[in-house]
Amino acid sequence: MGYFSFVLCTAAPCTAPLGMETRVIKDAQITASSEWDLNHAAIQARLHFKEDGDKQGAWSARSNDANQWIQVALGSYTKLTGIATQGRNANSQWVTKYQLQYSDDGVHFHYYKEPGQSSPKVKPQQSDNFKSLHACRPTILQLTN
């Protein structure tokens, strides 16, 4: 079971977050392939999301396999320079690696690749539940609308 929280940034070194933590990005903009249950919903994929009653402090997919995804629809073209990830609050649970995809129509997605590489970049996750920033070089200029 993987836990994942992140923030999308507009300027290196992540000085202008897009709003995953502050909720500028609304719950309706966040979807996922599956959720463990309502207490581990996609809308809980926010940095520093705190456990609150039944809410468990992170998104968790129903299945532990490579076919799980989480999507943030930004609504317009956005320059993305990095992604911050974080494990589940107050627990020793986190994603160990992930791949990033982007789209300009929400239907056709492209894997993020580093310059000169033909294979999708596998982003490593930290080995603890503290926040970790992963730069996107080159930056991504288009995301789902």
Residue ranges and their predicted role:
Residues 4, 8-75, 88, 115-117, ...:
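Disordered, acidic Ser/Thr/Pro-rich linker "stalks" and the adjacent N-terminal cap
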Residues 27, 80, 95-99:
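Exposed beta-strand and adjacent loop surfaces of beta-rich binding modules
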Residues 50-51, 83, 94:
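Alpha-helix boundary/interfacial micro-motifs
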Residues 71-73, 82-86, 101:
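Residues within well-ordered beta-strands of beta-sheet-rich folds
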Residues 57, 64-69, 90-145:
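Trp- and acidic/polar-enriched beta-sheet ligand-binding modules for extracellular glycan
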